[in-house]
Amino acid sequence: MSKTKTKPARLIVAASDSDADMLYATKFWAPDPFIFLERNGKRTLVLSDLEIDRGRKQADADEFVMFSELEREVQGKSKKAPPYEKVLAHFLRKRGVKSTIVPANFPLRYAEELAANKIRVRATNGFFWPEREAKSNKEIEMMSHALRITEAGLKRAVEILKRSKPGAGKRLRWSGKTLTSEMLRAEIDSAILRAGGIPTGTIVAGGDQGCDPHERGFGPLYANTLIILDVFPRDAKTGYFGDMTRTVLRGRASAAQRKLWETVKAGQALALKKIKAGVDGMTIHKAIQELFAERGFPTELRKGRRVGFFHGTGHGLGLEIHEDPRLQKVTLKDRQVLTVEPGLYYPGVGGARQEDVVVVTKRGCKILSRFPKQLEL
């Protein structure tokens, strides 16, 4: 009689505050690494004395083990506490684990210790939990809430910009002071916190600063200048991210600024019409580039600097701000949640980007973002 092949155990060692796979598995927030083991359908957590009682109340698991008990077993009569990886290997040996599947970011020293104990370690390529790619109705609901938090930040930014007035040198003034990127970012982040979110790297980039897509922005903001507002907070309760970008201008736009902004808006509208399960994302990306070039905005090198549309069209969104897939590198699938964020960047005119979040469907896509697009404030 042939023996039944035992499936490898699924193993994560990470802090769920910063590791999406661990948070997805356990629904439990913790700032320090702990052990997750799934074997034969049973989920076990190894937690510190500090966290185990809270874990029993909050975490999605079948069994809870105290790390300190395992540590004492390994330490024996030694006066020195054993390294974490020794305790991990001991725990797996006690459970009879011979083979494991781990995330791609599994710590090397842990993998080496397990290998030394004849425990096979195989890293995944892509999602550790494949089901993370197609979002459930509950996840879509949670991400919609994260977008409402995002919109609270954008709303505050627009309110302040509308109240600001141009001063000397066209510097915007608000509340008796020169309005800076730092001040506006602080106001956006405060609104996010009040709405139940965690700010993460909010971008307020005016003028040519906006031509570097990940420049956070610094210094005074000016009238009649394009300002990129890219807001991507995390819901403090669920861990899911929102992500939206609007490009605005306080004052009057020049013909060149308006053309840039309108072209980006048209590029995003084109993408939204083409998104559908089964479509090659690269065809969408190329269609946007072609539209931009036809309207006089080629992507090229000028004086050693990239101009035009030189980043991706969008990315997956969920428990990570950037997760698989990259829109332009895959065939789209039903229930993927993606950002759609074309942009154009030309020093001297400025940068413009519009970003919304969609759910891919078999018939097209559903837009989850609600915040309006308005150039002049």
Name these PLM-found stretches.
Residues 1-377:
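Active-site neighborhoods and metal-handling regions in enzymes and metal-associated proteins
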